[in-house]
A protein has these predicted regions:
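N-terminal, active-site-proximal structural segment of metallo-dependent hydrolase catalytic domains
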Residues: 1-48, 52, 58, 63-64, ...
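Metal-dependent phosphoesterases centered on the DNase I-like endonuclease/exonuclease/phosphatase
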Residues: 31, 52, 125-212, 216
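Active-site beta-strand termini and strand-to-loop segments that position acidic
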Residues: 71, 95-98, 222-223, 248-252
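Surface-exposed cleft-lining segments at the edges of enzyme active sites
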Residues: 82-83, 108-124, 159-164
Length: 252
């Protein structure tokens, strides 16, 4: 069995002072993916002797960034999706393993008044093309902060957020297209009707205390691996970021 964890840490240096290493050891994942590390190369040295470490950094300092820590050494590693326009912000890492590709992604936020939505749509199209090109070789699992609540059940206040970044019709439609292309939202695969299961809460309104949240962190799994998928969960008990970790286990 393999346990995979994904967590948007909203700044790894900040979360290091909030029990990150204790949480990391307790969760004991075979593969641990991070988004929004907000680091440049050499700014942090994590002592993880049981893990191979892979980091992708944004050109812009203190922004975006991803990392993957894995107990099994991958066959190959790719940073970005091979399109320069989309590879400036350290948003994607791909590891190839014998039975699957594992990708972590930090999808661009469409921002206030949806001012970055046009770029977001371009990124979504390019990313889907990328995973489908890999899928021709072996099944794909991707995880991360996808910056979209797919259905109304995936956020506390859908009625007031239809024009908000993360719940626009355009963003939701792009995610539907991914699922229609042969992928599973792993959490909804097991819990199609479970309510108030969120992975992000705004800092501004003490939303986490009241569980006024959004589920925007996912493991998306190729339908080729459906029978291998054992469980999916959300670790709302883990603090330190405005997001919490999400998990799947696989019979691999």
């Amino acid at each position: 069995m393999k346990k995979l964890i994904s967590w948007n840490v909203n700044g790894l240096r900040a979360v290091m002072g909030k029990n990150f290493m204790e949480d990391f050891k307790r969760l004991d994942a075979d593969i641990f993916c991070l988004q929004e590390t907000k680091l440049q190369e050499g700014q942090i040295d994590l002592d993880l002797p049981d893990y191979f470490q892979y980091w992708n950094y944004a050109v812009k300092k203190g922004y975006s960034g991803t990392a993957i820590f894995t107990k099994d050494e991958p066959l190959s590693v790719q940073y970005g999706i091979g399109i320069e326009e989309h590879d400036q912000e350290g948003r994607v890492i791909t590891l190839e393993f014998p039975e699957f590709y594992l990708i972590t992604v930090y999808v661009p936020n469409s921002q206030g008044e949806l001012k970055r939505l046009p770029y977001r749509m371009e990124f979504e199209d390019a990313f889907l093309n990328y995973i489908l090109s890999l899928e021709k070789k072996k099944p794909v699992i991707y995880c991360g902060d996808l910056n979209v609540a797919h259905e109304e059940i995936d956020l506390k206040n859908p009625d007031t957020n239809h024009m908000s970044a993360g719940f626009s019709d355009e963003e939701r439609a792009k995610f539907s297209r991914v699922l229609d292309s042969g992928y599973l939202d792993s959490f909804r695969h097991f819990y199609p009707d479970k309510e108030e299961e969120y992975s992000w809460w705004s800092y501004r309104t003490k939303a986490r205390d009241r569980n006024v949240g959004w589920r925007i962190d996912y493991f998306v799994v190729s339908k080729q691996l459906e029978k291998k998928l054992l469980s999916a969960s959300i670790h709302q008990e883990v603090m330190g970021s405005d997001h919490c970790p999400v998990e799947i286990t696989l019979d691999l």
